[in-house]
Amino acid sequence: MTNSIVLVTNEINPYRKSFYDGLYKYCESIGIKFTVLLMTKVEHGYNWDYEKVKSDYAILMKGKHFSFPISNYLNWEVLEDLKNLKPDIVIVAGSYFYYTNWMVIAQRYKLNYPVYFWSETHLQEARAYNSFLLKIREVIRRILYSKFDGFWFSGKLSRQLIERYARKDAKYHFVPNLIDHTTYLNTSASLRNQRAELRAKWNIPLDNEVLITPARLSWVKGIHTFLDLLNEAALRHKVTMLIPGTGDFKDEIELKIKETGLDVRLLGYQQQDSVIELYSLSDFFVLPSLSDPNPLTCIEALWCGLPLLVSTHVGNYPEVIQECQNGYVFDYANKTDAVEKIDKLLSSSAEWRKSAADCSLQLANKYYNPNNVIKRLVDDMVRENSRIEKSGHKCP
């Protein structure tokens, strides 16, 4: 019988909170205690307020943060917390490099719980690692993935990577990113009728094609590389690109904007209501990432009924895009094709845009409806755990 589920992760951020809230509520409704163990309040480089996202089901552990050679955590309280919580199932998230997660793995036999890893990375991510670091990563990944009893995977691409390293008897559960979908769906639908007023508010010409890219201003988001492609589009002079977000790559992006002369607006950090406004006045969602495991913004765009244009490095593109029906996936390795897809999007008819919006909403409901996903996930894991208990060996 499953009485306790524990998720060990680096932080609770505003984008994941609705998912954790949903897990807690559903687990509580079927008599399961759900707990989140946190390694830190807020990851370095992010600016949300921990006081607004903290929850009664979450425990902030004491520990130490390391920034070299990569960001890492060592939370010595995790073992005591696990002893007290007596979990039947443990999920670790964030990174398999975290020392805290290593401690959880090391104690799974002693404390008798299976460990699942929430893996969102995929084989098509571009990383700025040198060959030595790549080799180290490969060795560590191969060792640690073989230790996990199962995985939460975010889509087709992430499962492909997992299967390369996991044990043959590993269990798999599809866990897409989830958001507070009703807020995006209902608010954006209402605001669509106020497009002229919203464009005037943000000083955007009504006849311009508006692209929205909510993203950190960082190298991995590929904004600087996408602007070179956009600059070759036939309708580039009728485009306004909105980028709500902050980051340490801002100067480089501003330089690229100056070089191209494109109408690209760096809007800085924006609250959720402002971001939904921006979605509602936009024509298309664009995410040109060079590395992006499982971005939530794609799911926000689906629930707002937008057509999408994303790169092949975006990990959930097989789930969020039906090629030509609600958008396009482009490859930086094929520059000509990428520019052609930008042109197709910008010159698309009103009829296609309406059909694409309907398709986006259908995909959102199919893959990213929290009411369906959370119940299926918990019920499947409980059934799986029950079978393991009956077999007489909880930890394979």
Task: Please place each PLM-identified region on the residue numbering.
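Short hydrophobic beta-strand element within catalytic cores of glycosyltransferases
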Residues: 307-311, 321
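Nucleotide-sugar donor phosphate/pyrophosphate-binding loop at the beta->alpha transition
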Residues: 114-116, 123-147, 190-194
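Donor nucleotide-sugar binding/catalytic pocket of nucleotide-sugar-dependent glycosyltransferases
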Residues: 141-196
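Conserved acidic donor-binding segment of nucleotide-sugar-dependent glycosyltransferases
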Residues: 323-324, 328-335, 344-350
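Aromatic "clamp/platform" in nucleotide-sugar-dependent glycosyltransferases that forms part
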Residues: 290
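Conserved donor-binding/catalytic core segment of Leloir-type glycosyltransferases
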Residues: 6, 205-221, 227-230
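Short alpha-helical donor nucleotide-sugar binding micro-motif in glycosyltransferases
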Residues: 269-270, 277-282
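Nucleotide-activated donor-binding/catalytic signature segment of Leloir-type glycosyltransferases, i.e.
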Residues: 253-270
